[in-house]
Amino acid sequence: MGLLLEWSIVKTLLLQLGVIAHFLVTLWLVVRVIQQQRRQSVAIAWIAVLFALPVVGIIGYMLFGEINIGHQYRKRSLMAQKLLRDFANAQQIDFNEISKNLDTEARQLSNIALLKTGLGVYDHHTLTLMTDADHIFASLLADIRAANTMILLEFYIVSPQGRVIELLEALMAATQRGVSVHLLADSVGSHAFFRSQWVKKLKDADVFVHESLPVGLFKTIVKRIDIRNHRKLAIFDNCYGYTGSFNLIDPDFFKQDAHVGKWIDVMIRVESHDTVNSVKAMALVTTTDISAETNANFSNLEKIVNRFTKSFYTQSLYIDTSKLHHRKLQHEANARGAGQNANPGVTQPPLLNILPLQSNLQAYPSVSQVSLQLIPSAPELTEHVIYETLVCAIFAAKKQVVITTPYFVPDDALLLALTTAAKRGVKVILNVPKKVDSLLVRFASQAYFEPLLSAGVQIYLFNAGLLHAKILCVDDDYCLFGTVNMDMRSFYLNMEVSMAIYNRTMTQQMLTCQHEYLRQSEPLQRDGWQQRSFGAKFLDNAIRLFSPLL
């Protein structure tokens, strides 16, 4: 009896000590939240989580509460970023001279990224908009098979299914021609790829495969594992580059069990042969990302970067070869249709549907002499740069703002920019997919629809699949295009890349693309939206409280 009494006292004492310890840890974390979190909405959300979810809230904050990419990775990344700036500065380019044809507001917008990244506006680019997977695969394959010296690929998701297999085989064939091929993929986004036989196959064929931001039990303790490399970049011979929303996936196979339809993506092919251009800036971004993942000594980091960029400083002549590229695509398409091999010695399975490719080539011809600016963003390195650029662009709008995004979870500043633009008489259109692959994001996004509709923002829900494109067009001469979603994860956590396009013709093409999406969407009516049930509204608004953490 005495032993039972003593054990009861011990249990009570342990429980009291546990409660006191939990309170002290929670209090300590609240102090850290107040000190570390610069955004008020995030701080309030985390404090609510800490008190509402005992123990779980503490574990959650320890794992995901603060931006931490790891000391060694941050050190390597900062050194790589310095090399990126040094490259831009070494060219001694007068960006004011290059951007002299831009209006004052566009020049001011470009200065935001120039200050953060060192990359300004470059001219003499030829851009080709691609809006379906057939065209994107055909163009990438053509450039892989034509590459002479270097191929750099950086993607969030690599899914070795369908037409992606043909692309991976083309990479292996390229190394046999003496081409240096590097593939950098995110550890989480490409989880299935890194556990497949394709990594060994590629490495055996002398393709360099790099895992970006690898995760593991120990890494979970020392850094945040939800900071991901969300970039999508492809560079060939320092003259041809791609970026956009497209991952290395075949939409006929990818996430078919999610019941959201096929993923709808866009990509832009950029071509330039100038000594300094945005394609070489793309190559530098991917090269620095690769070098940040290596275990080489810090003193050798510059050598690693220079190994990829040694040809950046050679003089070259600007030649617009976009028409030759299109003729090459058409020639290969016709050869496949005739059962011929357009490139002897390379196996080309007849996987492409030619008709959509030809119609898209006619719909979106290449646009030459385009001025554009590459804007890479990453936590603790160039954080907030794309967010600041985007919000300022919306505030500067005079006629229209058209947004296409798969995920829309704004903060107060972005919401204010959109609602005040609509109240100023600017036509503001937001197009999001009706179905997304994240229920939490869907509910959080819906919570913002009512204030947007009340302000006069037009909202459309895309019906023909998961609209994954990320496009912002302002008026008729400025466009932001790339990998950035309209949510805080893209703005503050992920490694992203965007292009600011300063060209009326190219912006008109982007607007045409966006209006094609709108034709496949249903408008959201304010009256009908307000008549939803109390339960539906409550659920959206409850999830909205945690939107700063999504």
Where do the protein language model's features map onto the residues?
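Short, solvent-exposed amphipathic alpha-helical segments in soluble enzyme
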Residues: 417-421, 447, 515-516
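Helical hairpin unit composed of two closely spaced alpha helices linked by a short loop
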Residues: 407-426, 433, 438
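Short beta-strand/turn micro-motifs composed of small residues
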Residues: 185, 405, 432
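N-terminal localization/anchoring segments of enzymes in phospholipid and broader phosphate metabolism
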Residues: 1-388, 392, 396, 436, ...
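A short helix->loop->beta-strand "cap" motif at the edges of active sites that frequently abuts
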Residues: 177-179, 424-427
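Conserved, well-ordered active-site substructure
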Residues: 472-474
